[in-house]
Amino acid sequence: MSKTKNTKQVMDQYETEAIKRWGERAESSIELWKSYTNDQRDLVLQAMDENYKVIAQLMHEGASMDSPEVQERVRIWHEQLYYFYEPSIEIIENLGNMYKNESEFRNYYEKIDPELPDFFGDSIAYYADILATKWIESQVLQLKE
């Protein structure tokens, strides 16, 4: 089974789980995703799969979760989320936790690499902390103006 086909199956699982958890917000995300052509969706899913593989490769090459190379890949993942919805820092944090701790997500990433769920989840947590810090700093600057 191709990785893209695997990703499509996971997307179906995401849809079901998302509607249960987030209701209307999830439904609007699904509507956005379904507005793309099949070719557009395939390209997005292929790019996402490739990004996961690169993260796993970097991990095996000894890169740490906070390395510039890994964080660039997490930034790319963050950008890819916009194909589905606008991800808040909280959503990003929650996704990282879900990838590590929830079996349906963990199983998907383990198929790419058994160590990927923990590494990717930790990398996402680090990225989210950086985003949160930058946001707080921007708010402090605004208050000083």
Name these PLM-found stretches.
Residues 1-145:
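Amphipathic alpha-helical "stalk" segments
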